[in-house]
Amino acid sequence: MPMDKTFNAAEAEARLYDAWEKAGAFRAGANASRPETFCIMIPPPNVTGSLHMGHAFNNTLQDILTRWHRMRGFDTLWQPGQDHAGIATQMVVERELAKSGQPGRREMGREAFLEKVWEWKEQSGGTIVNQLKRLGASCDWSRNAFTMDPNFQRAVLKVFVDLYEKGFIYRGKRLVNWDPHFETAISDLEVEQVEVNGNMWRLRYQLADGATYRHPVAFDEEGRPTEWEERDYLTVATTRPETMLGDTGIAVNPADERYAHLIGKEVVLPLVGRRIPIVADDYADPSKGTGAVKITPAHDFNDWGVGQRTGLRAINVMSGRATMFLIENPDFTEGCAPSEEALALDGLDRYEARKRVVALAEEQGWLDGIDQDRHMVPHGDRSKVAIEPMLTDQWFVDTAQIVQPAIDAVRTGRTEILPERDAKTYFHWLENIEPWCISRQLWWGHQIPVWYGLDIWPARFEDDGDDTLDEVEIFELLEDGAFNHADPTHHCAFDFEGVSEKFLDDLASLPHPLNNARVVEVASRAEAIDRLAQALADYNLNEDPTHLVYPVWRDPDVLDTWFSSGLWPIGTLGWPEETPELARYFPTNVLITGFDIIFFWVARMMMMQLAVVNEVPFKTVYVHALVRDEKGKKMSKSLGNVLDPLELIDEFGADAVRFTLTAMAAMGRDLKLSTARIQGYRNFGTKLWNACRFAEMNGVWEGHATQAAPPAATATVNRWIIGETGRVREEVDAALAAYRFDSAANALYAFVWGKVCDWYVEFSKPLFDTEAAAETRATMGWVLDQCMVLLHPIMPFITEDLWATTGSRTKMLVHSDWPSFGAELVDPAADREMSWVISLIEEIRSARAQVHVPAGLKLPVVQLALDAAGREALARNEALILRLARLEGFTEAASAPKGALTIAVEGGSFAIPLEGVIDIGAEKARLAKTLEKLEKDMAGLRGRLGNPNFVASAPEEVVDEARTRLEQGEEEGAKLSAALARLSEIA
């Protein structure tokens, strides 16, 4: 059946992917013929996600490496999977419930809500898997993993318990990013900085005990004070007046002469009456604001640091919903008598409280002034609500105890990070690491395996010689609040059965009847108190010690998504079980990832795998850059410049999208993506398709089985192209081995389009009518087969379709053997001759184009001095040169005729007479005018780029665009200058 005229990507992609899956082409170990393994872990996309350009880029690079190793016979596994994406998924499901009019999360309760989440996951969670398939991702989908799968959950909980028991996980109170909308701590990666128009309020804090000081108010030209005024207050500046209720200090720089003598004194906090100290800290910058900084350790990360260094208290004055928490807050009222105005703020939203504080400051005279201020405010990337730094009880990993092996692994080369600059980022983060907050106040996720029970010890019970508690004693305990005020104690265990034993062990030392208690799980501390009180009362009625219950409740929080995804390499391979996959594929070979998650994911995987199994998770980390729009701007919905990879696949085909991303994947450099580039690479696929159609029409594959070795060839053209094929195979392998994806793509582009389609196909046409026809058919078939094989990792669909419709194949291209030949195929004599022929044709074409010779006009050529090798090459290839350079014929002369253009080649030169063909004077004038205008434009660009202010202050994409235009202009200028020089040589 003859080939179609064009490649129908939309039809072929679905058909071919289905065929690959049915053949088991992507399964681990498929096509393995050698003992080496190659394993790569997909960075698990969110189960809520859909394919964006970052995914398309990242997964294209992974697929190239996977297909390349699979074709080379490696035992290959590309492990796919999705992340449960705690906060994102919970948000999506809650939104769906609201849309459908169903009860909200809190109304239906945790268990029922989680059932809804699982229902949603089964119905909608596979979207991105299908989208990755459209891209051509050759993952082993039979092993598709999910971070909430039962086996993965076992791994996550075991690691938590193990690290807890080693002392690497603890519960503590620290400042975290708090999202008031979701009422949970979130990671730095889930915070986006938003620039807002706001105000800077200056507030006066009265010095305590009637203290005063001289404050400079006028200065001379050298900045020395010349006038002072007596003040009994300090002025501080803030963008968040509502937080002043939690102030516990004023920081001044110890080198600031204005305030140094006040260090150790106190001010009285307005509205609250709290006396707070003036402390010395370098965080206060004398050149910024008033030089005195209000310190609120519980609501600002910088202030928290000052508080830790200077011993200031941290007072949280907000609830989880960012409303003011004052009246029932013992920390707020301790040591002071807040005014009625302050207490009236209780329960107000933080922004409403801000207005009231400012109004009160103005009314009471401690508002010093207001300045407009444009500043950055952190927002939750999903809630779009301003983040509140919040002091809360959370679970933390003591990263300082597990970080060093992760640093050493990269320093010693056990794991290599490419490019090297990203290794520096990795080291910087890890060497300045903070405790990692791993708890989230959500329901969807890995619930923390910690159970709490009421801490009721023997000291609470009087020993009256009787092992039982009578009714009077029970009610006395209840009246005394033994249960209502009992502190919780906790135990960590893999499951409730394990933790029950720990609580029973603790009860062994308690007085009867508690030492015969049965441990049961309850929902909350309040329920635990009720259950224990009832159990004690029931005991006194029936005196049956086995009837007693000792209630415990589980920590309601879940683990940070990064905690579970940090175990992705071992968890997906079956750990903690000693599975064959774990033994075979771990540690993995390479991780392909974006620079934005080096710390959040890469560094944590390194730390956790080394802490858990004492092994690095991967040998190489390849960090790719961002995909931007064609002007270098970051893609965003607000700018309207987002390119949807699925829409691009619909329009241009997956192969064109993949090849574009690959060809632009220069290590460490952002991609500037345009549809014009993608269209150009679609044309590249069309070029290969047309070359194969030409070959088919000339019977190239008829009766020829696919062969790995090149055919025997005697014709110079055939010997030359066989050598070029060997060269490009070596180039592609070297590039892929070094993760220079762009070099591999560009080498293939130059070979397939340039050497094969533009030159070899044209050179071979006359040979089909000679005695070299059979050899040429065999050579062309072999060369085009190698094009398909070498291109397949980057352009899998069109190459597989060509493979299936040409020749006699024993297996699909996806499992075809990768060639091992190389530069040994180069025939030096054929290489020299055909390189000379190509050089001559290109020089003639270039000269014609530069001086605007009409494209269809055939010109005579005069052969000047030419060595023996050149004469032989010309004699053997004269007909080709005449046809492809559009020449009338060759004559020979000792010197160039008048009005001729000289062409220099290796071993000699030629002349092209132009007299009467073009108006040389007019052409020179045109070129000179064009060059003059271009030079003027270039001078302007050089001036802008030479201005440090422009380079420093202009948007990055504007500077990059100017540099690109200058580079392109200089290249065009060089061409124009060369053309002028050619014409100037004409006598």
Swiss-Prot record:
Gene3D superfamilies xref list: HUPs (3.40.50.620), Isoleucyl-tRNA Synthetase, Domain 1 (1.10.730.10), Valyl-tRNA synthetase, C-terminal domain (1.10.287.380), Valyl/Leucyl/Isoleucyl-tRNA synthetase, editing domain (3.90.740.10)
GO cellular component terms, A-Z: cytosol
Motif ('HIGH' region): 45-55
A matching Pfam family: tRNA-synt_1
Coiled-coil segments on the chain, per record: 917-985
Segments carrying motif 'KMSKS' region: 634-638
Enzyme Commission designation: 6.1.1.9
InterPro entries: aa-tRNA-synth_I_CS (IPR001412), aa-tRNA-synth_Ia (IPR002300), Anticodon_Ia_Val (IPR033705), M/V/L/I-tRNA-synth_anticd-bd (IPR013155), Rossmann-like_a/b/a_fold (IPR014729), tRNA-bd_arm (IPR010978), tRNAsynth_Ia_anticodon-bd (IPR009080), Val-tRNA_synth_C_sf (IPR037118)
Reaction equation(s) it catalyzes: tRNA(Val) + L-valine + ATP = L-valyl-tRNA(Val) + AMP + diphosphate
Top-level enzyme category: ligase
Cellular localization per UniProt: Cytoplasm
Broad class of where this protein is predominantly found: cytoplasm
One Gene Ontology term of the molecular function aspect: aminoacyl-tRNA deacylase activity
One GO BP: valyl-tRNA aminoacylation
Positions bound to ATP: K637
Alphabetical keyword list: Aminoacyl-tRNA synthetase, ATP-binding, Coiled coil, Cytoplasm, Ligase, Nucleotide-binding, Protein biosynthesis
PANTHER family xref list: VALINE--TRNA LIGASE, CHLOROPLASTIC_MITOCHONDRIAL 2, VALYL-TRNA SYNTHETASES
Annotated NCBIfam families: PRK05729.1, valS
Domain notes from UniProt: ValRS has two distinct active sites: one for aminoacylation and one for editing. The misactivated threonine is translocated from the active site to the editing site.
Alphabetized HAMAP family for the sequence: Val_tRNA_synth_type1
Function of the protein: Catalyzes the attachment of valine to tRNA(Val). As ValRS can inadvertently accommodate and process structurally similar amino acids such as threonine, to avoid such errors, it has a 'posttransfer' editing activity that hydrolyzes mischarged Thr-tRNA(Val) in a tRNA-dependent manner.
Family assignment from sequence similarity: Belongs to the class-I aminoacyl-tRNA synthetase family. ValS type 1 subfamily.
Subunit note: Monomer.
Protein name (database record): Valine--tRNA ligase
